[in-house]
A protein has these predicted regions:
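A short C-terminal boundary segment appended to hydrolase-like catalytic domains
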Residues: 1, 265-296
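Beta-strand-turn-beta hairpins that frame and shape the catalytic cleft
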Residues: 1-8, 135-146, 175-183, 233-240, ...
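N-terminal active-site segment of His-dependent metallophosphoesterases
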Residues: 1-80
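Active-site neighborhood of phospho(di)ester-bond hydrolases with catalytic His/Asp-centered motifs
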Residues: 9-11, 64-69, 95-102, 148, ...
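Active-site environment of divalent metal-dependent phosphoester hydrolases
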Residues: 14-17, 73-76, 102-110, 152-156, ...
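Internal alpha/beta domain cores that form substrate/cofactor-binding pockets in large enzymes
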Residues: 40-53, 60, 74-96, 193-195, ...
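Extended active-site neighborhood of metal-dependent phosphoesterases/phosphodiesterases
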Residues: 81-169, 212, 235-238, 262
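Conserved beta-sheet core of the metallophosphoesterase superfamily
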Residues: 196-269
Length: 296
């Protein structure tokens, strides 16, 4: 019997510290974001927390790591090289898959920097000469399907959007993969449901219709900076959608401290067995196991 495949999931590192910004870089939405960072966010997004979380994750020796966006904060040019160095420290491109978040496409001027900087971490197995969404990467029994919900938005908005072209391509991919023997994991930054108008995935209804028609085994997302488990309709059974807190965060108000998920995936008869272990920053004792849940 083969050992279970172990997939780690972290999100929203918002890599600190924010580099020095030139005045000309802080026009429009970035001015709001820079003010928010200097007054507030720098207090609870900590590099030492992020490094401790990644170190603990690597000690678990996962077979693959999924990172669901928001590596940077304001998408300043000066943020991308440090983010690339950090991601290389998490693992090589064959062992880590990443999709962008809204902060990675914060403004139109640098919306394409994420793909150019991290292309080898989000390139599909059959599209090695190009980078586009959706993409598919097969790792053991797992098929990672990456989509991008990252689009520039006006100030005070953090919505996501997939668009007709990406949804159409995803429809084709999911239809084909429904006939394949794979544990399908959809990676997207935004949650599939949100009560907040300013933070929602605007075409989530179309995505949910595709999932109901074709199915996947698991959805992983970030964005909300909280522990989250939601269940959505699939063709035969409910689909779990799992969110995770920011990987660099201290606890504040209703936002929990940094955590990551570790999924153990293996065949169970004609189906799949998937168990989730949550590890994160405890109150006094560093990174520890917070809970275990069987999802299927």
């Amino acid at each position: 019997m083969m050992a279970a495949f172990r997939l780690a999931h972290l999100s929203d590192p918002h890599l600190p510290p924010l580099p020095a910004a030139r005045l000309r870089d802080l026009a429009g939405k970035r001015a709001f974001g820079y003010l928010n960072w200097t007054r507030n966010r720098h207090k609870y997004h900590r590099r030492d927390v992020l490094d401790a979380l990644v170190s603990d994750m690597q000690a678990q020796q996962p077979d693959h790591v999924a990172v669901t966006g928001d590596l940077v904060n304001l998408a300043l040019d000066a943020e991308f090289n440090p983010a690339r160095q950090w991601l290389e420290g998490v693992g090589g491109a064959a062992d880590v898959t990443v999709v962008p978040g809204n902060h990675d496409a914060y403004v139109r001027a640098t919306r394409h920097r994420f793909v150019s900087m991290f292309g080898d971490y989000l390139r599909g197995d059959t599209d090695r000469a190009a980078t586009h969404f959706p993409f598919v990467r097969r790792r053991g029994p797992v098929a990672l399907i990456g989509v991008s919900s990252a689009v520039p938005t006006p100030p005070l908005m953090a919505t996501g959007w997939l668009g007709h072209a990406q949804l159409g391509a995803l429809d084709t991919i999911l239809a084909r993969m429904s006939r394949e023997d794979a544990f399908r994991v959809l990676l997207v930054h935004h949650p599939l449901h949100s009560d907040g108008h300013a933070k929602r995935l605007t075409d989530s209804h179309q995505l949910l219709a595709l999932l109901k028609r074709h199915g996947v085994e698991l959805v992983l997302h970030g964005h909300d900076h909280i522990h989250s488990t939601m269940w959505f309709d699939g063709p035969e059974r409910k689909i779990p959608a799992i969110g995770v807190p920011s990987a660099s965060a201290l606890a504040r108000k209703h936002y929990p401290a940094a955590a990551y998920n570790l999924f153990s995936i293996e065949r169970d008869g004609n189906g799949w067995r998937c168990e989730q272990t949550v590890r994160g920053l405890g109150d006094r004792d560093g990174i520890r196991e917070l809970k275990q849940v069987r999802l299927s």
